[in-house]
């Protein structure tokens, strides 16, 4: 055994997938995982910088690790991910106890860099981004035993004015379809029952290499033996096609859940955000989804407090929310990100106004979610058993194909089983029920 490592992951599912590839390299080098900071010989923080709160958490944790390193000077401490890409050497200037800073395009170099630092103790900063690089054949140490994250592409070409992602993840680069399918097959062979295909905008998959588009890839993955559920995220509304909708409709294992971030319900703000669609265009795409996939769940993201937002804009968004009736909406306060066009826009919205509007938005959505779930009372749904509930070990937790959490009494079922559950107590965020035996 070379030593022990601990990795902390902040941010999106893509960061989780990157961290699994980092862990794979460390384990291949002889390191074993520990959850105890004091026992670790290597500590990594895989970071996010989409919102200021994410960066604040990282800086707080960096301060904690400084105290650990004072008692364990041989500890190797590295910062990876989007915040590492954005800040680079600034992180080391601010916190000299950091040994290396590794950008989003250098995940594959982790094993080598850790070995070099262990031997030479020379600090490293590597945040170079190759516009075309897609690394394959990295060892993967997956978390869990049921659901596997499978990146299909990296980067983003959309440049929404509020978003830092294109600057820290680079331009879109798609993996070759045969590489994605091979990874899914390996996951199935390892016992995984569900895969989630990941990308900043999965609907753009394949535009760079032309070998297959996202609908083609979905069909290939749907055919992999042993995989019972196929999910994907995230979709940009401008790129969702009738071909993709038909592929989901005709698939066997493709789940009837589409996350389609609208971000706002006012054309004026959508234009300022550079979302390149209108409310009307989004509405039509959502209509096509619901027409082809009755019973599918539609979820979204919404940002409150974008620069220049007026009460009239916000009222339009509330009206749009009531019209769309999403199963769930992930709501966020606008976070000013230096280097993005929105950060320099006039009429930044005061924090107290942002918070008040967010509360109003969430109240409307909670009411909608509760009403939609109430419509499932007495329905029988297929649930994949994921494990014990966080709050009660006597209760199983699982999800439907439409991505709704279902809680039901612990019986003879095992993790990974697929069971039929009758819904008896619909709630805003979860469904409670009983197994149909």
Question: Which sequence ranges carry the predicted segments?
Answer:
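Proteins enriched for Cys/Gly/acidic motifs involved in redox and nucleic-acid/cofactor modification
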Residues: 1-205, 243, 258, 280-291, ...
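Thr-Gly-centered strand-to-loop micro-motif
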Residues: 9, 34, 272, 329, ...
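Conserved SAM/AdoMet-binding glycine-rich loop
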Residues: 74-81, 86, 189-311, 322
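Short flexible coil/turn linkers enriched for glycine and charged/polar residues
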Residues: 143-146, 156-158, 254, 264, ...
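Conserved, mostly hydrophobic/aromatic
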Residues: 160, 180, 197, 232, ...
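Terminal RNA-binding accessory module
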Residues: 344-437
